[in-house]
């Protein structure tokens, strides 16, 4: 076909056909602060229960701090841990990103919890079956025995969701024996 004919055919096509989403496209994930808090606590505490450590409590302060960093990433497009001096001593941090609106909070946390498949008991950072502690770092922060609080937040750019969880006291400390404490 000639390019001019293709252009004419494209211009003659109904605009609505190009703008309507496919019926096979997934519906946007449910969102909201109450759902975020409920989903996050449920997913974290299920993982902690399986590991044999006490439940986490929600921290509004940690959630507010997480929101600041999530917004920063959404505004700048720079994905990475908060580099604010002293933040690491104050709170642990887990990050996730994905296509805007497609993933539920359960999926966001579930990706982190799924790292359990690579976990092996040991002295941190030697706690990964693969030899790479970063492949279990989200999971180990979630189940870290001395962590008592979590707060998470979500911010979005035009295309990307940025999800941040903060933990206190922070986990993933070198030299700490980390083993499941199932009864």
Say what each PLM segment does.
Residues 4-12:
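Sec-dependent N-terminal signal peptides
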Residues 15-19:
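Boundary at the C-terminal end of the N-terminal hydrophobic targeting segment
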Residues 21-78:
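A short alpha-helix/helix-coil micro-patch that ends at or immediately precedes a cysteine
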Residues 56, 79-81, 95, 142:
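Short clusters of hydrophobic/aromatic residues that line enzyme substrate/ligand-binding pockets
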Residues 59, 85-88:
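Short, glycine-/polar-rich solvent-exposed loops and beta-turns at beta-strand/coil boundaries
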Residues 77, 81-83, 110-112:
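Metzincin-family zinc-dependent endopeptidase catalytic domain
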Residues 88-183:
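A well-ordered secondary-structure block
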């Amino acid at each position: 076909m000639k390019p001019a004919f293709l252009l004419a055919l494209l211009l003659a096509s109904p605009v609505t056909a190009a703008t309507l989403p496919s019926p096979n496209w997934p519906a946007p994930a449910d969102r909201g602060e109450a759902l975020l808090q409920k989903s996050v606590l449920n997913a974290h505490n299920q993982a902690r229960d399986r590991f044999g450590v006490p439940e986490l409590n929600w921290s509004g302060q940690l959630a507010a701090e997480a929101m600041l960093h999530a917004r920063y990433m959404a505004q700048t497009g720079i994905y990475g841990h908060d580099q604010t001096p002293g933040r690491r001593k104050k709170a642990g941090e887990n990050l996730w990103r994905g296509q805007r609106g497609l993933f539920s909070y359960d999926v966001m946390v579930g990706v982190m919890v799924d790292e359990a498949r690579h976990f092996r008991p040991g002295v941190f950072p030697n706690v990964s079956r693969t030899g790479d502690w970063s492949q279990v770092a989200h999971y180990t922060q979630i189940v870290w025995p001395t962590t008592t609080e979590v707060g998470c937040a979500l911010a979005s750019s035009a295309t990307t969701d940025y999800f941040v969880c903060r933990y206190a006291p922070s986990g993933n400390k070198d030299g700490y024996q980390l083993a499941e404490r199932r009864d």
